[in-house]
Amino acid sequence: MAKVYIDKDASLDPIKDKTIAVLGYGSQGRAWALNLRDSGLKVLVGLEREGNSWKVAESDGFNPMHTEDAVKKSDIVIFLVPDMVQRYVYRERVAPYLRDGMDLVFAHGFNIHYKLIEPPKTVDVYMIAPKGPGPIVREYFAKGGGVPALVAVHQNYSGKAFEKALAIAKALGATRAGVIETTFKEETETDLFGEQVDLVGGITQLMRTAFQVLVEAGYQPEIAYYETINEMKMIVDLIYEKGFTGMLKAVSETAKYGGFTAGKYVINEDVKKRMKEVLDRIRSGKFAEEWIEEYNKGAPTLVNGMKEVENSLEEQVGRQIREISLRGKPKS
């Protein structure tokens, strides 16, 4: 089992006298900047232009500056701009101002693992990957808790990169829950795999296909939505809170029997084989190459995919079901 690092295993000492530049002020950027500042660290916010994020940062009490100015004044640079933008920000706004002994920090390993960013050997490169969205990272921290995180070291020029990674994790609140050490390779490949075959791709497609099967068989769309999509939250919540065994204990005997038999029929060895093929594409770098090419063309697959989902019957029915659910929600 992996070692879990908690508060007592980490100290802010390795970074307490450092100036930290947070590049980006979106979901994760805002949470990181606020949590690091509230932990007593000196934080600068670096942005590409004076847009909405600039105004939000100002309203939060920061004095945002252009990215290159933040880099020039900092010891630690944290990349919290979108994955597909990072290499351009690094090349144009960060690399020209890097000094020996600086730190480059990432929340996801994509750009380092696939060599879209190749830092000089004279800087530390490490990662802290919170296992939750930015608003939750901030909310849990503000309430005295924390979201778990993964940490990894790619380059250890100073000999203290891991200690600094733990320090930032502590400042984010992650060590209040638990931090697990990984590698850039492992985090990147497992994260992409989970998104594609499970969280964003697999489960979404499974629910939509199940809905379509019922509707095509003549069942009312509203009933089909309840049975194949809406109730997913209840099952996932049970798994999150009690594990698979706890979830199974909470459902009926009929549901368990049907699940054990039909589940393995639908998600069979052929599906597992295809999952392995998806993993092979991720590990070989083919997915990254394809995604970069797609992005450079304006991401037509994303544009068309979003249009198809937005106009689908299940999305239309879902809006109606959510309205019904909201009407029945108790007033707080």
UniProtKB/Swiss-Prot annotation:
Binding sites annotated in the UniProt record for substrate: S252
Cofactor note: Binds 2 magnesium ions per subunit.
Cited SUPFAM superfamilies: 6-phosphogluconate dehydrogenase C-terminal domain-like (SSF48179), NAD(P)-binding Rossmann-fold domains (SSF51735)
Pfam families: KARI_C, KARI_N
Family the UniProt entry places it in: Belongs to the ketol-acid reductoisomerase family.
Job description of the protein: Involved in the biosynthesis of branched-chain amino acids (BCAA). Catalyzes an alkyl-migration followed by a ketol-acid reduction of (S)-2-acetolactate (S2AL) to yield (R)-2,3-dihydroxy-isovalerate. In the isomerase reaction, S2AL is rearranged via a Mg-dependent methyl migration to produce 3-hydroxy-3-methyl-2-ketobutyrate (HMKB). In the reductase reaction, this 2-ketoacid undergoes a metal-dependent reduction by NADPH to yield (R)-2,3-dihydroxy-isovalerate.
Keywords recorded for this protein, A-Z: Amino-acid biosynthesis, Branched-chain amino acid biosynthesis, Magnesium, Metal-binding, NADP, Oxidoreductase
GO molecular function: ketol-acid reductoisomerase activity; magnesium ion binding; NADP binding
Stored HAMAP family: IlvC
Binding annotation for NADP(+): Y25, G26, S27, Q28, S53, D83, M84, V85, Q86, G134
Protein name listed in UniProt: Ketol-acid reductoisomerase (NADP(+))
Entry EC number(s): 1.1.1.86
